[in-house]
Amino acid sequence: MAIASRRLKTAYSIWWVTFMNGKISRRSLMQTASVAAFAASPGDAATMPAPRFEGKDTPKIALAIGDGGSAQSDPVDPLRRIRQLGVEWVLSGGPPIPWDEARLKEQMDRVKAAGLNLGNLMITGFNNAIYGRPGRDEEIEKVIASVQAAGKVGLPVVEYNWYAHRATEGYFDEIDDVRTGVGWTSFDYELARGPGHQYMGAVREGEASIKFRDLPPLPNEGAHSLKEMWETITYFLKKVIPEAEKAGVRLALHPNDPPAPISRGSQQIMGSVDGWKHLIEIVKSPSNGITFDCGVTREMGENPVEVCTYFASRDRINHVHFRNVKVTKPYERYSEVMIDEGENNMFLVMKELVKHKYPREIYPEHPRALDYDRERGRIGGYPGGGGYASFAFQVGYARAMMQAALMSV
């Protein structure tokens, strides 16, 4: 038994040091782990520490309400499907503003009855505030009322976007031939939407041959500079964040995704890490935070671990999107791939979140298209996107990363 124990410790130490430094392939990891398992004995297992699981002070794996959605031929409660994966936290889009306390409580109670907790709602419906147009003060008051209602029912996080134009035009589907048909969601700033691919959104008349980078502003949006966008969000934050603090609610601004520098003539304030850093300095409060998306971070050519450290150490990560990408050209050409095969070391990202005691939701979003979901009509509403089967893989992978991180920090 002592010899077996020494073998296990040696194999485990080699594996752990190598893995922690991000220098091990999946095949090598499995081979080394197999050696360690072979070396173990029942006596050794009795002395090994028990795994740690999600708790009050740890990150929480979450899915969106609807991620467990089923086809009409199989009408299983989607919340039940989510709970079956071991997920205890969910997020969702919010109702029209202003939010009503009674309606929010009803939604939270419905989720609670399914054994789940609602941790994040997306708030929308304030374009005049984003563009600095007449009516923005009325919209901001509706946002404040919504945040106050969220605080009264115990909703911890309200997420939002600040796009002049939310690009869909540059996305298309690609197929992973090595992984025999897995769907990727790819983005190309130089894309003109010709035949041969699935695209996101309808092609507007006369635009099929125009590259995304050259598309003109839409009449209802116009073109907006960085200066304009910073002015409007500063005005918004200085009114909303003090009220969010009083309500005990954290706001999480999602980065611009895609982070292309110009989106239909408008610049993007959340299209760079410098922009993210500037945002949290406008109002210095934990209620003024970001959605840390390690996929977008890599799309911009940045190191997600370093960026995570910067914001987590300042307690400004209020929500997390956990996904992987392969980048051809930062900002302009990349593919969203399976969570276990991109350029991000997902374990090191998770470890950094655990190290800084991040306690809120982690959403392993953007599942890849698998045949199982395709055959059942359960695929995402975007090119290359998948459904429940792929979410099950993402959740299992993210939870494994979390348990390993909790054991290592």
Identify the meaning behind each predicted range:
Residues 67-69, 96, 124-127, 162-166, ...:
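Active-site-proximal loop/turn and secondary-structure-junction residues that shape catalytic pockets
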Residues 93-234, 246, 296, 354, ...:
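Structural motif corresponding to the early beta-alpha repeats
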Residues 69-82, 139-147, 303-309:
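Short, acidic/polar
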Residues 1-24:
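N-terminal secretory signal peptides
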Residues 62-66, 93, 119-122, 159-161, ...:
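A cross-family glycoside hydrolase active-site/sugar-binding cleft signature
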Residues 50-74:
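Boundary/entry segment of secreted carbohydrate-active catalytic domains
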